[in-house]
């Protein structure tokens, strides 16, 4: 009764109006699962391949009909007949069917859509929530949210190099209250921006994209918003960055060129100067997490940054690790970073995603489950964050339904877990000396 009888993919749109995949999996019992695939704007060069059509006459070349065809005509034939509960076997079968190291033949987007839909169908068959199916009886930790309330870099037209300025409501007693803290700060920030005559339009991830005078101006404005909402910076709420440094790293000159986003007169920093600058910001402001502070291929820079700041700040590898256990394993051995960002479409299956989270935890690294800038209404990452007791999630600002869908799902999960639910707050940063 739990045998897969049909697999079907279609092309749908993501939050940027670009095509992506939606996959449906059906079983003999009538149990059903649907998965939608996100897409990134700033992508690591080592990520699994997102298969696009390349036909400029259709969606500017971004169509996904090739990936849709691969699901409907190749993957479906291979996995029909499998027990929908055998997630690992199905994921491994798709990896083998693709046969490339980066899923470039079938497309990570095709494979991931099926992987998510299979898990949802299995949960539906067992009549249990997705987080319970994926995580088992010990599922209980609601994640501390990283709320991206200022968008810069490749996610907006704002003249700021850093891609994300985030707030983390670590002092809240529950996830529900953490969400309230964030929403109140978001609205306080909007009032401050309006009072300064700055833009309040939002970027890809729902954060504001104003023309600040620089990084420090952005941070100080966020601190003012935290205080205006009635909270204490560095106690109730901390600040985090996603520098997305690979987006402004000049490989030929081996410098971090802030002029790419901030214009003429902006800083151009060596790796050592980049580390000095990040340390300066950490010493000046209540910053608890920095993502991709160095370029994805700057292993020496990552090691030096970790030696300098790794005991006091969470240093998250996104483009650096691309949710890949090979890169994470090397980072652990070489003492680079102390946390990994988990993006399901960087690696392409739920099985490999869970492998990366497990490896990180075993090494004492934290794991931050994350969205992409091109999202959908699919809320699977909320269930993954709780299923793995990851303790942290990054899923955008307090606007745009594609972001709020994940927060609302976490509210439902917290309600369903009842007294068992735990919100760790600051304890989610278990590898830092507080």
UniProtKB/Swiss-Prot annotation:
Its main location: cytoplasm. It is found in: Cytoplasm; Secreted; Cell surface. GO terms for cellular component: cell surface; extracellular region; peptidoglycan-based cell wall; phosphopyruvate hydratase complex. InterPro entries: Enolase, Enolase-like_C_sf, Enolase-like_N, Enolase_C, Enolase_CS, Enolase_N. (2R)-2-phosphoglycerate binds at residues 163, 343, 372-373, 394. Binds a second Mg(2+) ion via substrate during catalysis. It catalyses: (2R)-2-phosphoglycerate = phosphoenolpyruvate + H2O. Pfam families: Enolase_C, Enolase_N. The active site is at residues 205, 343. Its EC number is 4.2.1.11. GO terms for molecular function: magnesium ion binding; phosphopyruvate hydratase activity. Pathway: Carbohydrate degradation; glycolysis; pyruvate from D-glyceraldehyde 3-phosphate: step 4/5. Its cofactor is Mg(2+). The keyword Lyase applies. Catalyzes the reversible conversion of 2-phosphoglycerate (2-PG) into phosphoenolpyruvate (PEP). It is essential for the degradation of carbohydrates via glycolysis. Belongs to the enolase family. This is Enolase.
């Amino acid at each position: 009764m739990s045998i897969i009888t049909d697999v079907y993919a279609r092309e749908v749109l993501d939050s940027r109006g670009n095509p992506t995949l939606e996959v449906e999996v059906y079983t003999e019992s009538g149990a059903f699962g649907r998965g939608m695939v996100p897409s990134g704007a700033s992508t690591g060069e080592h990520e699994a391949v997102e298969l696009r059509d390349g036909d400029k006459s259709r969606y500017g070349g971004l169509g996904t009909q090739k990936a849709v065809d691969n699901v409907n005509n190749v993957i479906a034939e291979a996995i029909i007949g499998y027990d929908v509960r055998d997630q690992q076997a199905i994921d491994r079968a798709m990896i083998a069917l693709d046969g490339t190291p980066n899923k470039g033949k079938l497309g990570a987007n095709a494979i991931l859509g099926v992987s998510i839909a299979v898990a949802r169908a299995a949960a539906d068959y067992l009549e249990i929530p997705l987080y319970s199916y994926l995580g088992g009886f010990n599922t209980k930790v609601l994640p501390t949210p990283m709320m991206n309330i200022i968008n810069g870099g490749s996610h907006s037209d704002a003249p700021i190099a850093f891609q994300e300025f985030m707030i983390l409501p670590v002092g809240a007693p529950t996830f529900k209250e953490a969400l309230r803290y964030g929403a109140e700060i978001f609205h306080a920030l909007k009032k401050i921006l309006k009072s300064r005559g700055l833009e309040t339009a939002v970027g890809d991830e729902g954060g504001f994209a104003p023309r600040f005078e620089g990084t420090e101006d952005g941070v100080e404005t966020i601190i003012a918003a935290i205080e205006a909402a009635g909270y204490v910076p560095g106690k109730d709420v901390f600040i985090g960055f996603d520098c997305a440094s690979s987006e402004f790293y000049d490989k030929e000159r081996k410098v971090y060129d802030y002029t790419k986003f901030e214009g003429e007169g902006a800083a151009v920093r060596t790796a050592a100067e980049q580390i000095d600058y990040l340390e300066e910001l950490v010493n000046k402001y209540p910053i608890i997490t920095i993502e991709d502070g160095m370029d994805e291929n700057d292993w020496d820079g990552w090691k030096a940054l970790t030696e300098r700041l790794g005991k006091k700040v969470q240093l998250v590898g996104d483009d650096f690790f691309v949710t890949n256990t090979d890169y994470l394993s090397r980072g652990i051995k070489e003492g680079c970073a102390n946390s990994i960002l988990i993006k399901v479409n960087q690696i392409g299956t739920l099985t490999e995603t869970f492998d990366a989270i497990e490896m990180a935890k075993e090494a004492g690294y934290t794991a931050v489950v994350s969205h992409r800038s091109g999202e959908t209404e699919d809320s699977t990452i909320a269930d993954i964050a709780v299923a793995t007791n990851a303790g942290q999630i990054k899923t955008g600002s307090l606007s745009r339904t594609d972001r709020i869908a994940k927060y609302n799902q976490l509210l439902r999960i917290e309600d369903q877990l009842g007294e068992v639910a735990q919100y760790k707050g600051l304890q989610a940063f278990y590898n830092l000396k507080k």
